[in-house]
Amino acid sequence: MQIPRSVGTHDGSFHADEVTACALLIMFDLVDENKIVRTRDPQKLAQCEYVCDVGGRYSTEHKRFDHHQVSYTGSWSSAGMVLDYLHGLGFLSHDEYEYLNNTLVHGVDEQDNGRFFSKEGFCSFSDIIKIYNPLEEGGNTDKEFFFALRFAIDLLTRLREKFCYDRVCRDIVKQVMEKESVCLRFDRPLAWQENFFSLGGESHPAAFVSFPCSDQWILRGIPPTLDRRMEVRIPFPEEWAGLLGDQLVQATGIPGAIFCHKGLFLSVWDSQESCEEALNLVLKQQRLV
């Protein structure tokens, strides 16, 4: 007889794929954390409603998600299998599925299946989960597994919150793109850059974006593409590079000048008025107005 809301996974050293798979099932209220069974005993696994990363079977109908058997020829690990399962059940929209997959789960699949290895100096999510394992192999790893599980749940929760926030921002960005040509003006800080390019920003004429931040205003150059995000379509004047306060005031002739990044892609102003003045100055120098 199966234990409702239970999930079985292998014991011993753990990896990001089964940790992520369990975290996803918990997040969507399909299993209980206190009903995670870590074992390789087939009889105990048979009692679990879900089984991840062990058991030699992949069947969404029977809620079995293992990828190690020869009969499975796909590219997923147990994490990708469970994410796809949740999508199929309607827990995730297509957009949210793509977001979670592209942001986290695909990387877990790639690393677990040996198709990706982190370069020196870089630490992936899978690397972090691996570090949660005990330093010495052998013995009980349940305590460390649950530490890693809670970390994964927290990260996935934050990613879902960010996805929802980004979708709200996307609507605002779309509205501003429809009415502005040279500069996208926002009345608050928001996630504009990725949304701008996902909405066709590469062909949009805007070269700048402005928005308030704390008690100041940001004027930033827009990149030509998302992949070239540290470049800008129109840079600030070279003589502004790296200047602060009075130095920038003297260089620009604008009393509200605070800072210009040495990369000439971002500047800070004390008010919306001084920010607009800076924008107009740059546009005049570029003979765009």
Curated annotation (Swiss-Prot):
Source organism (scientific name): Chlamydia trachomatis serovar D (strain ATCC VR-885 / DSM 19411 / UW-3/Cx)
Annotated family: Belongs to the MYG1 family.
Protein name: MYG1 protein CT_386
PANTHER family: METAL DEPENDENT HYDROLASE - RELATED, MYG1 EXONUCLEASE
Pfam families in the cross-refs: MYG1_exonuc
Top-level taxon: Bacteria
UniProt-listed InterPro entries: MYG1_exonuclease (IPR003226)
